[in-house]
Amino acid sequence: MKLPTIIERGRFPSPAPAPQALAWDGNKLWMGSRDLRRIYVIDPKKWEVLEEKKPPGIPWAAVATNGTLRFTIGEDPNDDRYIRRFAPETGFSEEDKITCPEFTGSYLSYDGTSLFLSQWYKHRILKLDAKGNIIRVIDIGAEVSGHTFVGGMIYVFRGTEQNGESWTIARLDPREEKPKVKDIAIVPFACRSLTFDGANFWSNHRTANEIVSFALP
C-alpha cells in the first residue's frame, strides 16, 4: 500500500542558513543554525526573532525539558557530541554536560522524565539516564533525522540521506518491549529535527533554508 504524504500547513523563511536544531517550548520555537552556530528564539505567530544565542559549538538538535532545554552540541575540533543544558535566564551550564555515547548522537526527545538520543548511522534511539548512560536501545531500522513524543508515542523521521534523500514519518510505542515502527506518511523534503506544538508538527527543510509546519494525513 502506498503511503500518503504529510499535509504542509506552512513554510517560513529561516532567520539563518542551514536550520538544523528545532524545539518547541510551549510558546516559542528554538532553532539552531548549523552553519552560523547560532540559536534563534522565534515567535511563530509573528514569525520574528525574539532572541539570538551563541552556543559552544554546532547546535545539532534541541528539546524542551520542563522549563529548560537540552541541545546536542558538536564541539571542535572533531565535532564530538555533548548534550548541554540551557536555561533561558542563565545560558549554557558548564557543569551539566553529558558526553554522548562514543561521542556520537544527534536528535533529542523527552518523555517528561528521560532524554532520548538518536544515532544516525546506528539506526537507533537510546534512552539515557541522568548521567548519559544507556538504559535502553530502540532499533528504528533506518537513519533517523528527528523524533518527538506525542501522547506517549514516539514519532520519528526515518529513511536515508543518500540518493536524493527519502524520508517517512513513523510512529512507535516505547512502552512495548520491542516496539514496532510503523510508517505513517511520506515526508517529501530533506527533513532535519522534529517537534510538536500541540496541534502541528514542525521540521527544518535545511537545504531550502525553510522551517515547515505540517500535519499527518
Task: Spell out what each predicted region is.
Residues 10-15, 52-56, 97-102, 137-142, ...:
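Surface loop/turn motifs at the tips and blade-to-blade linkers of beta-strand repeat domains
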Residues 10-37:
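Beta-strand-rich domains and repeat architectures in extracellular enzymes and scaffolds
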Residues 17-22, 57-65, 102-111, 140-151, ...:
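Repeated scaffold domains used in trafficking and secretory/extracellular systems
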Residues 30-36, 71-80, 117-122, 156-164, ...:
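Conserved beta-strand positions in repeat-built beta-propeller and related beta-rich domains
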Residues 38-40, 78-84, 125-126, 164-170, ...:
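Structural motif
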Residues 43-47, 87-91, 129-133, 173-177, ...:
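Short loop/turn segments that connect beta-strands within beta-propeller blades
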Residues 49-66, 73:
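Blade-loop segments of beta-propeller domains
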